[in-house]
């Protein structure tokens, strides 16, 4: 089943910069896809279009049967409930505990307290941080904070995880730990799309690679290589 379809997608910013042009992509449910390319090639725009942080200038984007490029603003929060996003800089709430950070994602969709506690503890166990539930973010390492961000992204059982440079601020060992967590989530059936500059991970853990150069798709390969010297 096709989870994501992009058909002739273009993005031009108000200053005239053409970030993406003529993008055609089909991603099946359950895939793990790397998005690679030089800095400024359009990777971030490509990723942001999928959760409607950006809107295409032209073209169609369909995710799980929903034409998100046509969605009215009031429907976007509901659409995003089916998508988990993991950022490079974690974006945790500093004054909330780890448990509270993850629970907040469920509170936003008005889940009951009866539902929240067992589910939050379940995902914290999945990312191996159940023992840190009462800790604050600044008491955790960078890798641990990113695992909390992943727990928050998956707590509402999304169909899709979008990870934008999730290992960008981490050392090689911690980066591989984060990668293993994302692979585990993918094995459970969740589609994962990961924008990255991490050559070692892409070349050592072979998955589908979509390479973007100058706003266009330059390569789309199964078990592809990174292909750049950063």
Feature names for model-found ranges:
Residues 59-67:
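Conserved ABC transporter NBD signature motif
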Residues 96-104:
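Short coil-to-helix segment of the ABC ATPase nucleotide-binding domain corresponding to the Q-loop/switch region
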Residues 51:
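Helix-to-loop junction immediately C-terminal to a conserved catalytic motif
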Residues 172-174:
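Helix N-cap at the start of a conserved alpha-helix in ABC-type nucleotide-binding domains
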Residues 161-164:
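Catalytic Walker B motif of ABC-type/P-loop ATPase nucleotide-binding domains
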Residues 135-140, 144:
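Conserved ABC ATPase signature
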Residues 157:
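Conserved catalytic motifs of ABC-family nucleotide-binding domains
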